[in-house]
Amino acid sequence: MEKIKNHIGLIIVSVAIVFSTFLAANAFKNRNSNNDTINVTGLGSKDFESDLIVWNSSFTKKSTDLKTAYASLEKDREALKNYLLSKGVKEKEIVFSSVGISKDFDRTYDEYQNVRSEVFTGYTLKQNVQVESKEVEKIENISRQVTELINSGVELYSDQPEYYYTKLAELKLQMIAEATKDAKLRAEKSAENAGAKLGDLKKSEMGVFQIIAQNSSEDYSWGGSFNTSSKKKTANITMKLSYNIR
């Protein structure tokens, strides 16, 4: 049951395509001799695994003295950088952002939520770090071991890694070809069932490009989905073709 649920999105798309082909065949049977066309939709689908990982995290320091806060942040930055290098991350894969500074206050409010008084309590300094690498498994493992840094005193906030595919353009072209071939086969079958032959291609239209997690119940989007939270993904695309019939 779980497997059926996981594939429900793809099933819905496939059923819709089959139904549209059925309608196309029936529409052709009742065709107007001055406008003999048939419309079909083909599907291209492929499972693939991400080859690029992006891991974002941040660390903070607080102090009533800005210079002290900077010094503490610098110490943590060096500790984090050395930790990543010791785990085999390349220096060029590590990017630190500029430092963000905010002033902190303790405030009291009146009954109308207007500030009655405020007392300065210090500065909060925050810096982001991003690791981008094609060594997906290595960075995954490092992201799960950040408690080592936290235990050493680095106040690190780790985000979930994001996963990408660097050959997406090539994959999309392959899938368009697959979806076009599928649509043409459906058109030929529909024409054959109606006792006719397929003519020239009149019009083609590409549907939205969907990337979702493999074996998931993730929803399809009319505007297109682009999953970045899963390493293993499934890509889908549709092609709508209109053929002349003779």
Sequence positions of predicted segments:
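Short, charge-dense linear interaction motifs
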Residues: M1-V95, V99-R246
